[in-house]
């Protein structure tokens, strides 16, 4: 049932192979769309019930879209009572979509694990010319998985096409740090990627798009991205620090001898680097302060803190590669925290824009802080948090690092010439 395709890097798109051969015989030009689209349209449920038929979605040159296999049909949903409660289609863009993190994440998104079992989604996958064949493989696996909520899959290499009208942008793709590469050079190279993606989001995405930056250094990449999107609110941008929060919860649970779900209100403050601050002062175990349960202050201040900060490096030594599955899980957790009401008295960690924050943290950077959500995709900062000298001193150290990174990328944020002075290398090994 699938449609065979021929890929032309020069055209940056896909052309059905039979059409390409026919065009050569007739000496005519076949239009090459820049996006290859796999589509199973969500149509009005009431109309489907009334018509009771499955019809083909227009494809190829006639409609400007191409479909593959089962995604070419509009399906009869009259036997599905749940169709009446299905929500409006949510469109999600994922960059670095052919990578290991995405390989775990995309199937969680398609299954309904993230947005719910009544939420149809469309996936728009961004890659490069080099990864395009791998993207086709990802598309094929998604098709073969028969997810009923997955209504469209598009693959492409241009952010202006892939980001068109998206509701969520999960920016995973970034250049890895090569041997001997200075951290300042990595900031510049990846900063240019996120500046370009920010401009594309600003031009074509939904005005209320939610952006989660995963590619490292994610805090400063998120700052660069939001500075290049004047038409999108700065509060819509997040840097992923949920994996760090999950790691901290794990260590507290292991030390206390409880299950993970008993641990709450664990905040990661600051940068996604070894200057991050896992906050045990405000954390709770079964509603009680952690320091009442774990009375070993030396362990909390030293071993616990360093274990969380260096977890990524230890993992790559053991596993031989950086975390992928746990990163995908943390992306799921981060999104669910924004689309699900936060339980009363609890909060979660995410890197957000600091301007207007109540803690005294420097403004105009992206800094991980404790947040709550009403489940509408937005958030508010938690205000009922405690500070002591130990916590505040470490927060200021991470703040200083982010301010230094900001100076390194001033040329990408519209703030003049860059000046980079990063004497200490605090990148997370294997996660850069």
From Swiss-Prot:
<keyword id="KW-0150">Chloroplast</keyword>
<comment type="subunit">
    <text>Homodimer.</text>
</comment>
<comment type="similarity">
    <text>Belongs to the LDH/MDH superfamily. MDH type 2 family.</text>
</comment>
<dbReference type="InterPro" id="IPR036291">
    <property type="entry name" value="NAD(P)-bd_dom_sf"/>
</dbReference>
<feature type="binding site">
    <location>
        <position position="197"/>
    </location>
    <ligand>
        <name>NAD(+)</name>
    </ligand>
</feature>
<feature type="disulfide bond" description="In oxidized inactive NAD-MDH">
    <location>
        <begin position="408"/>
        <end position="420"/>
    </location>
</feature>
<keyword id="KW-0521">NADP</keyword>
<protein>
    <recommendedName>
        <fullName>Malate dehydrogenase [NADP] 2, chloroplastic</fullName>
        <ecNumber>1.1.1.82</ecNumber>
    </recommendedName>
</protein>
<dbReference type="InterPro" id="IPR022383">
    <property type="entry name" value="Lactate/malate_DH_C"/>
</dbReference>
<feature type="binding site">
    <location>
        <position position="216"/>
    </location>
    <ligand>
        <name>substrate</name>
    </ligand>
</feature>
<feature type="disulfide bond" description="In oxidized inactive NAD-MDH">
    <location>
        <begin position="67"/>
        <end position="72"/>
    </location>
</feature>
<feature type="binding site">
    <location>
        <begin position="214"/>
        <end position="216"/>
    </location>
    <ligand>
        <name>NADP(+)</name>
    </ligand>
</feature>
<dbReference type="GO" id="GO:0006108">
    <property type="term" value="P:malate metabolic process"/>
</dbReference>
<keyword id="KW-1015">Disulfide bond</keyword>
<feature type="binding site">
    <location>
        <position position="177"/>
    </location>
    <ligand>
        <name>substrate</name>
    </ligand>
</feature>
<dbReference type="InterPro" id="IPR015955">
    <property type="entry name" value="Lactate_DH/Glyco_Ohase_4_C"/>
</dbReference>
<dbReference type="InterPro" id="IPR001236">
    <property type="entry name" value="Lactate/malate_DH_N"/>
</dbReference>
<keyword id="KW-0809">Transit peptide</keyword>
<feature type="binding site">
    <location>
        <position position="247"/>
    </location>
    <ligand>
        <name>substrate</name>
    </ligand>
</feature>
<feature type="site" description="Activation of NADP-MDH">
    <location>
        <position position="72"/>
    </location>
</feature>
<feature type="active site" description="Proton acceptor">
    <location>
        <position position="272"/>
    </location>
</feature>
<keyword id="KW-0934">Plastid</keyword>
<dbReference type="InterPro" id="IPR001252">
    <property type="entry name" value="Malate_DH_AS"/>
</dbReference>
<dbReference type="GO" id="GO:0009507">
    <property type="term" value="C:chloroplast"/>
</dbReference>
<feature type="transit peptide" description="Chloroplast">
    <location>
        <begin position="1"/>
        <end position="40"/>
    </location>
</feature>
<dbReference type="Pfam" id="PF02866">
    <property type="entry name" value="Ldh_1_C"/>
</dbReference>
<feature type="binding site">
    <location>
        <position position="190"/>
    </location>
    <ligand>
        <name>NADP(+)</name>
    </ligand>
</feature>
<dbReference type="GO" id="GO:0046554">
    <property type="term" value="F:L-malate dehydrogenase (NADP+) activity"/>
</dbReference>
<dbReference type="Pfam" id="PF00056">
    <property type="entry name" value="Ldh_1_N"/>
</dbReference>
<keyword id="KW-0560">Oxidoreductase</keyword>
<dbReference type="InterPro" id="IPR011273">
    <property type="entry name" value="Malate_DH_NADP-dep_pln"/>
</dbReference>
<dbReference type="InterPro" id="IPR010945">
    <property type="entry name" value="Malate_DH_type2"/>
</dbReference>
<comment type="function">
    <text>The chloroplastic, NADP-dependent form is essential for the photosynthesis C4 cycle, which allows plants to circumvent the problem of photorespiration. In C4 plants, NADP-MDH activity acts to convert oxaloacetate to malate in chloroplasts of mesophyll cells for transport to the bundle sheath cells.</text>
</comment>
<feature type="site" description="Activation of NADP-MDH">
    <location>
        <position position="67"/>
    </location>
</feature>
<feature type="binding site">
    <location>
        <begin position="96"/>
        <end position="102"/>
    </location>
    <ligand>
        <name>NADP(+)</name>
    </ligand>
</feature>
<feature type="binding site">
    <location>
        <position position="183"/>
    </location>
    <ligand>
        <name>substrate</name>
    </ligand>
</feature>
């Amino acid at each position: 049932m699938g449609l065979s395709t021929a890929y032309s890097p020069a055209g940056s798109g896909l052309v059905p192979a039979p059409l390409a051969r026919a065009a050569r015989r007739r000496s005519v030009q076949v239009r090459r769309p820049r996006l290859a689209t796999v589509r199973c349209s969500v149509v009005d449920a009431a109309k489907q019930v009334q018509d009771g038929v499955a019809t083909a979605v227009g494809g190829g040159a006639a409609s400007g879209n191409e479909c593959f296999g089962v995604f070419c049909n509009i399906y009869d949903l009259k036997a599905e009572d749940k169709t009446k409660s299905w929500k409006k289609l949510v469109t999600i863009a994922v960059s670095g979509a052919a990578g290991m993190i995405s390989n775990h994440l995309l199937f969680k998104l398609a299954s309904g694990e993230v947005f719910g079992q009544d939420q149809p989604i469309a996936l728009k996958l961004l890659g490069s010319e080099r990864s395009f064949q791998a993207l086709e493989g990802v598309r094929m696996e998604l098709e073969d998985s028969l997810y009923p909520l997955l209504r469209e899959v598009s693959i492409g290499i241009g952010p202006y096409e892939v980001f068109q009208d998206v509701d969520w942008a999960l920016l995973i793709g970034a250049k890895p740090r090569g041997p001997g590469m200075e951290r300042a050079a990595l900031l510049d190279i990846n900063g240019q990627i996120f500046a370009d993606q920010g401009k594309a989001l600003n031009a074509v995405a939904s005005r209320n798009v939610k952006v989660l930056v995963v590619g490292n250094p994610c805090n400063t990449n998120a700052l660069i991205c939001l500075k290049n999107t004047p038409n999108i609110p700065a509060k819509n941008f997040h840097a992923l620090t949920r994996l760090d929060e999950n790691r901290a919860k794990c260590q507290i649970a292991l030390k206390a001898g409880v299950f993970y779900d008993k641990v709450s209100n664990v905040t990661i403050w600051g940068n996604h680097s070894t200057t991050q601050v896992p906050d045990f002062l405000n954390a709770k175990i079964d509603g009680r302060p952690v320091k009442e349960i774990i009375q070993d202050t030396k362990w909390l201040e030293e071993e616990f803190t360093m274990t969380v900060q260096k977890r990524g490096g230890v993992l790559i030594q053991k596993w031989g590669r950086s975390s992928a599955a746990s990163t995908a899980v943390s992306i799921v957790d981060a999104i669910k925290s924004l689309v699900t009401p936060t339980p009363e008295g609890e909060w979660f960690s995410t890197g957000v824009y600091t301007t207007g924050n109540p803690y005294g943290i420097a403004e105009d950077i992206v800094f991980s802080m404790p947040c709550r959500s009403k489940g509408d995709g937005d958030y508010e900062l938690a205000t009922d948090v405690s500070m002591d000298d130990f916590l505040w001193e470490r927060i200021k150290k991470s703040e200083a690092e982010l301010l230094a990174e900001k100076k390194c990328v001033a040329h990408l944020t519209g703030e003049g010439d860059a000046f980079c002075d990063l004497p200490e290398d605090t990148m997370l090994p294997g996660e850069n």
